């Protein structure tokens, strides 16, 4: 009699193996070598954080002498409330680079926080209607690392947000384009067939 591992356990094992083999993208070296960054705020979602997907990025940054603060309290669609929760850490830590690691929600959060870093009182609903209200940020670089294969958010000027009434709002501005966009196949190995659908 040969035991068969349940599908859920097999999937969990495959995800754990993929995550354990992750290494940080080589392009991250530019943050210290070229941009001379000292403080990074890393934005990801709880699922990726708990799976350890962002850990190689954090390790690489710290190895380069860059201090790292992490924020991962965001929902499936990043909300205004999520962003308000991140503002104290953003303003206290004063990063010179904001990194988003994940899918559209984490990358949208990173983009929106870049705009709020310049103007913490920015009316996001008004900015969604008028892109001219979105300020350019000279306080921090934006780096986006895709950890899914569906949205293309790592190369787009859009941030998809949910307002306080549950309505979807989309920020759009060239100022939300990243300084560095990283698409690394290693960072999608953790995805399951169900996760891609």
Task: Give short role names for the model-derived ranges.
Residues 1-70:
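An N-terminal, well-structured beta->alpha segment
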Residues 12, 62-63, 92, 113, ...:
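N-terminal loops that bind phosphate or other acidic moieties
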Residues 16, 118-197:
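A glycine/threonine-rich phosphate-anchoring loop and its flanking beta-alpha core
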Residues 34, 56-60, 115, 158-161, ...:
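Short, solvent-exposed amphipathic alpha-helical segments in soluble enzyme
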Residues 38, 96-98, 179:
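Conserved acidic residues
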Residues 41-42, 97-99, 143:
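Conserved beta-strand elements of the Class I
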Residues 49-122:
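N-terminal small/polar loop signature for handling phosphorylated ligands or for N-terminal nucleophile
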């Amino acid at each position: 009699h040969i035991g068969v591992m349940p599908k859920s356990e097999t999937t969990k094992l495959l995800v754990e193996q993929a995550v354990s083999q992750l290494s940080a993208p080589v392009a991250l070296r530019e943050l210290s070598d070229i941009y001379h960054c000292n403080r990074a705020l890393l934005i990801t979602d709880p699922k990726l954080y708990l799976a350890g997907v962002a850990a190689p990025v954090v390790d690489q940054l710290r190895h380069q002498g860059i201090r790292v603060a992490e924020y991962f309290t965001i929902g499936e669609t990043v909300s205004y409330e999520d962003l308000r929760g991140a503002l104290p850490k953003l303003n206290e830590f004063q990063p010179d680079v904001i990194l988003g690691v994940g899918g559209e929600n984490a990358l949208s959060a990173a983009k929106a926080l870049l705009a709020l870093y310049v103007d913490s009182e920015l009316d996001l609903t008004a900015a969604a209607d008028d892109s001219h209200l979105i300020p350019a940020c000279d306080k921090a670089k934006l780096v986006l690392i895709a950890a899914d294969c569906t949205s293309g958010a790592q190369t787009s000027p859009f941030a998809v947000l949910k307002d306080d009434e549950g309505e979807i709002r989309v920020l759009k501005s060239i100022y939300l384009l990243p300084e560095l966009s990283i698409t690394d196949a290693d960072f999608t190995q953790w995805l399951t067939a169900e996760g891609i659908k």
